[in-house]
Every structure is written in C-alpha cells, then in structure tokens.
C-alpha cells in the first residue's frame, strides 16, 4: 500500500500530490500509513504507528496550517465478533482517537471491514487485524 509512480507503478513515493488547477499553487496531498505487524502485538500501538507513518510520508508536502490542515481517513480490517477481537478493536480506535486529539488532527471519515473470517466445514480462519490510515490535506 504505497503511492506508486511511473508506468511500472514503482512504490517510490512518500505522498501523492495533485494541483487543483493550472493557475495557482493550491493542491491536494495524500499519504498512507499502516503497521500490521505492530497491530498483531498491540492494537493501540499499531493504530498510532499507522498515523505516524502517514504523517511522516506527507511531511514532504508543504502544509499551509501545519498539522491542523491534515484530515485522516481511518480504515480498519478486523475479525470482529471473534474471541478477544472486539476489545482489541476498541483499544485501537481509542488509541487513534486520543492520539489524533493530542495532535489536533481530525478523522472525519473512514470505513471498516469487520467480517475478516473465512469459514470451512471443519475450520474457521480469522484474518490478522489491520489498521490503515490515509491522510489528506488541501492546500
């Protein structure tokens, strides 16, 4: 999950930028952060690391109003309603909320995939939890 560039879609970019028009210096910047391995160990740390990576990636774009010009989209893929997973999801969302409040960043949007489980006749397989942050700023 990286911003890619060129005809071969090489994952070399930290952020994606787009001009709003041809006549001004205004535009939009986006970046992505994820930390699936950290989320396996500690879901709260995984969500904070995802935010940290997204912010580190977008820092290469000028921000008119510093961090307050950034908005996040929180996306989580989680095997909810399985033993222990609802509390881990709550921990991740709470950590995200607290961290963003401390930084002065809003999270106006997001999406979830909470049915991350595959059922077979004699077995069930749950997917590992995954927290994915996308941030964007309009300059």
Give each language-model segment a name.
Residues 1-139:
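Glycine/proline-enriched, intrinsically flexible loops and inter-domain linkers
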